Amino acid sequence: MRIGILSDTHSLLRPEVLPLLAGSDHILHLGDVGDPEILGKLAAIAPVTAIRGNIDTHGPCAKLPETEIVTLAGPYPEVAFYLLHDVHQLDLDPTAAGFSAVLYGHSHKPEIRHHKGVLYFNPGSCGPRRFQLPITCGQIVIDKNGQIEAKILTLPIQQ
């Protein structure tokens, strides 16, 4: 299973991200959507699960949940992802809760790390550039044994 992951679009869905998400079985947006039409465009590619970020507290995106649990099963052992916008607001023990991964955004800084057997993954931002950070999104591939491989995908953008 292939999962496309993005965050911090801030009302800008760059056309360069769409080919990177093509072929995804599911897409996760980790908050700061901005324009809800972005979710519709993503849904044309694959089913979408989205959460609200700190810029989504008013308007149509305010209806998005603050956190979400996504459980996926297939020809592999079940995997469970915990989605939240800001990892500093994590108020549970992901290992004790049985999560395979904690997926988050907010900082615009891509990150892949493991702690106590749990993947912590921030795809970075594929919206407006912040400081000198790269423009990125992410991908998770789950193999037939339930192993999770996370990748940061850099968009081909110079400016």
Identify the residue ranges that each predicted region occupies.
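Non-DNA-binding regulatory cores of transcription-related proteins
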Residues: 87, 91-97, 102-111, 115
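Short gly/pro/ser/thr-enriched loop/turn and capping motifs at secondary-structure boundaries
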Residues: 57-58, 110-112, 129
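Active-site neighborhood of phospho(di)ester-bond hydrolases with catalytic His/Asp-centered motifs
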Residues: 5-7, 26-32, 49-54, 82-85, ...
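A structural micro-motif
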Residues: 1, 25, 46, 79, ...
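Short active-site segment of divalent metal-dependent hydrolases/proteases
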Residues: 11, 35, 88, 109, ...
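N-terminal active-site segment of His-dependent metallophosphoesterases
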Residues: 1-48, 56-65, 71, 133-136, ...
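Binuclear metal-dependent phosphoesterase catalytic core
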Residues: 69-77, 97, 114, 121-159
